[in-house]
């Protein structure tokens, strides 16, 4: 039995490639993914926790389908349950190994924290009846609720976002006291706004999380239970496995597809990387490059429609458009991102002279699609429903039901009671970290609104940047990346959308969707940007490579993510805004050629090895082509054309010799 437990997990088409053991994967997740550091429950207690998480998922379904409650009641109940489950699952310190143990202080904190939010639920009508004139008891309850949510955040999400929230709360007190008000008055005002109104903890972020995000996380859990990730990997193998440097291309395709379902760049890097990274190394790629390809591709899963990262749902709410519109406008930038990585891995394979996987070791596309293509039905149906104008909640619930139905033909994935509970459990657990991050981010957004800090930031940035839009964009990018080094994507987006996005829109005149997409992108790429590049470090751990070098290569592979947001900020035609068919076609063609030029220049190879001058011509020409404009397009074509011509001449000379 022990031998079976330690067996190598191998879903690769190459039989002799050793992938990581389940223990290896778990160890890496615990190191780089805070959500994986949980208490050790066994036996009956483990089953109790399991069913509580499943019940939480059912509660979310009930609240969205049947409950006709006041929004503040629903959100407070949601946060209270999240606190209970978080304390049951996450210990005070990382690496806790005690089994079936929860300290008495954790029980006290859990009861106090959840009790604060349940107190508001029970006394809701009384509290809103006297508006801002909350009692001393209600102030104490609010303080407890905020403080214990902060401790929950430290355990589940991490310290960086907690530090940011603490700074903003301190600013709220500084602002109030600076106006000459007494501390007690300021305290009551801060607690009322941040705890009892929809301008704080139970604000828009938690509202979106308890509806759209939670339901889509649940949909992802059920979709994963159908075996769709394995299908995606096999599909990628059938499409690209035999081509030049096939395993790296398989990693790009499979990670893009699987990333839509997982929603976690670190989690996706570890799960798909345990298969793709060893295969890339066996083919001939360096460990650093293999880990970087997986990390960059997995991180991009959050920008890939139709199921983007949780922040995309918040973006739709904050911009005031349907999620379907956000997903539609994100299609081209996402395709460019993955095309850039795809081109780079192809050029690296050509430079190294790498081959693909033998065709007889790969699944055939036709038979594979006939056998398992039905697994795509829930995704296709989801896209169709969103385009047809279904509400996001309704579309997610129907798509989840379809995921259950499509699991039935295969006895290995058939949704029996055990698998059904497992999917509910996974959905409930995966919701916790997003919910906690949304609650704390709501505090930050609340302080910005309550104090007028947003207007001060606009004045400050405009004062520094003047009318130079590029300076404002650059400062915003740096802020996003620095915050993203320790703050989850969802919380990062909320912070940036309430602070920096208004600067770009109101101070610089940038399109609202483009500005929000800008901060969304840079919040995501923080996962592969040194020095705190968690997805890249996770890929490095699997590849057994140098972490910093892996992170630097991942940043180079994802160069499109650092360029594209600037382009659609200046010219939203890339997002299909204010443009016609000709404009869209032009920007697609020029951007693709431009990406090829940039990738070739950075890689140092086009049709042969590039010298310094050829690399500069390729990079500058590529950037000119990506930047919208007739003059820049002409300059770009000339420069990339010269570099390509020099390469062709060099290749002919080498062939003649």
Segments from the language model and where they lie:
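Membrane-water interface regions at transmembrane-helix termini and the short interhelical loops
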Residues: 38, 63-68, 90-100, 126-127, ...
């Amino acid at each position: 039995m022990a031998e079976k437990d330690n067996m190598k997990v191998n879903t690769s088409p190459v039989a002799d490639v050793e992938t990581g053991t389940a223990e290896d994967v778990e160890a890496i997740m615990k190191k780089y993914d805070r959500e994986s550091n949980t208490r050790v429950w066994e036996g009956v207690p483990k089953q109790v926790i399991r069913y509580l998480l499943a019940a939480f998922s059912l509660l979310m379904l009930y609240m969205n389908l049947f409950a006709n409650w006041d929004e503040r009641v629903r959100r407070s109940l949601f946060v209270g349950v999240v606190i209970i489950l978080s304390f049951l699952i996450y210990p005070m310190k990382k690496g806790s190994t005690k089994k079936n143990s929860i300290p008495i202080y954790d029980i006290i904190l859990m009861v106090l924290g959840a009790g604060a939010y349940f107190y508001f639920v029970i006394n809701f009508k009384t509290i809103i009846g006297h508006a801002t004139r909350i009692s001393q008891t209600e102030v104490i309850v609010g303080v407890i609720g905020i403080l214990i949510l902060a401790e929950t955040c430290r355990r589940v999400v991490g310290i960086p976002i907690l530090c940011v929230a603490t700074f903003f709360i301190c600013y709220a007190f500084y602002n109030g006291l600076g106006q000459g008000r007494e501390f007690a008055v300021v305290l009551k005002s801060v607690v009322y706004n941040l705890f009892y109104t929809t301008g704080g903890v139970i604000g828009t972020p938690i509202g979106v999380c308890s509806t759209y995000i939670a339901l889509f996380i649940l949909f992802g859990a059920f979709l994963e239970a159908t075996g769709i990730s394995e299908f995606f990997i096999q599909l990628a193998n059938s499409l690209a496995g035999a081509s030049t440097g096939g395993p790296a291309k398989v990693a790009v395709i499979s990670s893009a597809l699987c990333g839509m379902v997982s929603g976690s760049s670190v989690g996706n890097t570890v799960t798909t990387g345990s298969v793709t990274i060893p295969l890339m190394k066996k083919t001939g790629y360096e460990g650093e490059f293999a880990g970087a390809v997986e990390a960059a591709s997995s991180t991009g899963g959050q920008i890939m429609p139709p199921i983007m990262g949780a922040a995309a749902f918040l973006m739709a709410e904050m911009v005031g458009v349907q999620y379907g519109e956000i997903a539609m406008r994100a299609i081209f930038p996402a395709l460019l991102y993955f095309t850039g990585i795809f081109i780079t891995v192809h050029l690296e394979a050509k430079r190294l002279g790498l081959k693909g996987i033998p065709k007889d070791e790969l699944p055939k596309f036709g038979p594979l699609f006939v056998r398992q293509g039905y697994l795509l039905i829930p995704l296709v149906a989801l896209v169709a429903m969103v385009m047809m104008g279904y509400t996001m909640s309704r579309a997610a619930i129907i798509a989840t039901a379809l995921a259950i139905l499509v699991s039935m033909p295969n006895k290995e994935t058939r949704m029996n009671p055990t698998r059904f509970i497992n999917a509910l459990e996974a959905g409930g657990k995966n919701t916790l970290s997003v919910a906690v991050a949304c609650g704390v981010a709501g505090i930050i957004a609340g302080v910005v609104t309550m104090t007028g800090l947003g207007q001060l930031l606009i004045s400050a940035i405009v004062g520094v940047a003047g009318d130079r839009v590029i300076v404002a964009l650059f400062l915003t990018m740096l802020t996003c990346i620095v915050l993203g080094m320790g703050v989850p994507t969802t919380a990062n987006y909320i912070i940036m959308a309430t602070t920096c996005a208004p600067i770009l829109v109101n101070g610089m005149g940038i399109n609202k969707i483009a500005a929000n997409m800008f901060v969304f992108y840079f919040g995501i790429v923080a996962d592969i940007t040194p020095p705190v590049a968690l997805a890249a470090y996770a890929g490095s751990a699997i590849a057994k490579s140098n972490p910093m070098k892996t992170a630097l290569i991942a940043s180079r592979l994802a160069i499109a993510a650092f360029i594209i947001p600037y382009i659609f900020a200046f010219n939203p035609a890339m997002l299909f805004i204010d443009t016609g068919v000709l404009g869209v076609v032009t920007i697609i063609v020029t951007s693709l050629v431009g990406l090829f030029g940039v990738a070739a220049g950075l890689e140092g190879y086009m049709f042969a090895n590039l010298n310094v001058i050829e690399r500069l011509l390729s990079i500058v020409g590529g950037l000119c082509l990506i930047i919208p404009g007739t003059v820049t397009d002409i300059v770009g074509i000339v420069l990339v054309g010269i570099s390509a011509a020099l390469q062709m001449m060099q290749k002919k000379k080498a062939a003649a010799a």
